[in-house]
Amino acid sequence: RLLGERLQKRGFAVEYIRADGAPGDRNSHPRINVVARYEGAPGGECVHFNSHIDVVEAGSGWTTDPFGGEVRDGKVYGRGTCDMKGGLASSVIACEAILEEGLPFAGALEISGTVDEESGGFAGVGYLAERGYFTKPRVHHVIIPEPLGVDRICLGHRGVWWGEVETLGRIAHGSMPFLGDSAINHMSAFIHLLETQLQPRLSRRHTAEPVEPPGARVSTLNINSIPVSNVILDGRP
């Protein structure tokens, strides 16, 4: 609501879109996206700034409260300040500056804060895309201010394919493991197969889309455990 209320005060038309039926959406924790639009003069195109508002788990090793937003020496410390509240704040401030200066423009400015980017995007960008929020003539250009740096500006996306694998075993007492069948061993063997057989084949595949930089055209393999899908784990008990 903070994002929507701030932009509404600036004259944006604000819409809250709950991802009904999407993975993770439930009444106790509804998955709600924010889309705010400011209409300029007619006849122009729409530029949309998209940022995700979810974060990965805090992890260990923090010397500050990961959700405290502490400001120290001109820097903000907290989980998600870089990825990607910083990009979201920059988008908001940039659009507000255009409006404050009274710069005339044709078309529209649009800002969205979406959920679920770190765990698949099904309730966030994916949900909105399926409902036409990013298609012409509604939106013509999308800028995603992820924290990559000015030397790593990307154009396009090579796409993604998600898969979920579950291995089964048979329980046994720890003193007699030979009576059981370890699901962990099965998963370990499967991961080894992916890394030795699939990964080399994927590394030779490149998207035909004009994605920039060229290194982002290469297919990669990311293996993680539920509930985290978009972070490389530093440890798991």
Q: Residues of each region from the PLM?
A:
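Acidic/His- and Gly-rich active-site-bordering loop/insert found
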Residues: 1-76, 100, 104-105
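Predominant activation on well-ordered alpha-helical scaffold segments within soluble catalytic domains
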Residues: 4, 89-96, 126-129, 184-195
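Short alpha-helix boundary/capping segments
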Residues: 13, 76-83, 175-183
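A short, glycine/Asx- and small/polar-enriched loop/turn
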Residues: 27-32, 41-44, 158-161, 214-219, ...
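Acidic/histidine-rich catalytic neighborhood of metal-dependent amide-processing enzymes
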Residues: 84-162, 213
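Metal-dependent peptidase/peptidase-like ectodomains
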Residues: 141-142, 151-186
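Acidic-enriched catalytic cores of C-N bond-cleaving enzymes acting on peptides and small amides
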Residues: 155, 174-236
